[in-house]
């Protein structure tokens, strides 16, 4: 490889082919990209050690999960923290196989893997291994959040080692394809684990209207996915005159009873991650990043950005494992917030949004939904969700939702919803036509809803009047897509572009076996999907 870097794991990769210049489209430098490859290679080496040694423990799995999560797009831009992770991985490998370093044989069985071997592999092998690796990275984010709440699953943990091991082996397509599908299977189990962790910790989400107006006075904006960090921040700010506003994927937190009981959790600020450099530029408040998606902050507001957990960026203030958010709170008090209430709107001008329509809430109204379908009030369901992003063409999803007929229901999730979640679509059968199921990991909830409807109507999921129209950006979308394929769900529309790491042969396999297809135009796709 004669280029400076190679990365094609996100939807915005350069030229829909791969970032190969001095920096990635996401903003990471060539040095960070190289270190992420080194970290991944070290994790493959660790998986080899796990395969050869029985002495694994909770620390082994936490390190493997943390290392994978750190390589997800827009998580870590910090050379120092990635180097520290590499050192920790090497130390853990040495602990697992202490006799290996003194062995006179140089078998290389437990060595780090050279990622250049993957990037230069035959394109179909590279494609399948990329699906395994990127899917494992996305799944690691969910496992990490569950782990922070004290929930873990040995089968899920061991699969991370299995997936990494497969990346480093010289296996053919017949050996790799079952592991690709197993990513989807294990991610379903992992999302179920996180759903259990969240609901047992914070209660079952219920529908709630969330204001977009920011009240006067000091406030903190918290973004990302980690509900545990939000809970700790709410506890530490209670009674201090500092209000809390969610941003991006943190919006669904408002539906959880144990979070919304805090009176100073006031509302939601801003929209999806790709708009942060504009939205954060002038706010008189700090922003706390708990997970991706962090964009390189502009100098005008960098002193107000804080990171925690695996999120890291050079020279930003990082909140460590003690989770003492005092610096964030002090910054909020010093900045003071707005002098008077300041109204904001969503992308389409709406002043409020709704969330909290998780599987618990929707299935709680199952009789109402079933009756609406049987009576003809509801003709079709659409799941329009997934990642937000900056590539031109994503307004497709706004127009698609706007054009859905009045006798259809739109379920949504993840940050792609901000393109349309402030629209007023009215009600149907006593329910809102637009229902936010939650974060990207709440795809598990959408699956539960679909399976319950199929059971109620005595049919398969693919026989339901249900269509999936998905947007993707990073690696969590990869593992969710593989979960849907594992469940045998067909006729998915995916956009705004197809992954650069999917080779033509692998794409043909997906098209032939699952009828997955790229989005075209809202008008044409609606016409086709409503005929099903």
Model-assigned labels for residue ranges:
Residues 43-201:
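Electropositive, gly/pro-rich neighborhoods at or near active sites that engage anionic ligands
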Residues 2-32, 36, 41-45, 178, ...:
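Anaerobic metallocofactor- and corrinoid-dependent redox/one-carbon enzyme cores
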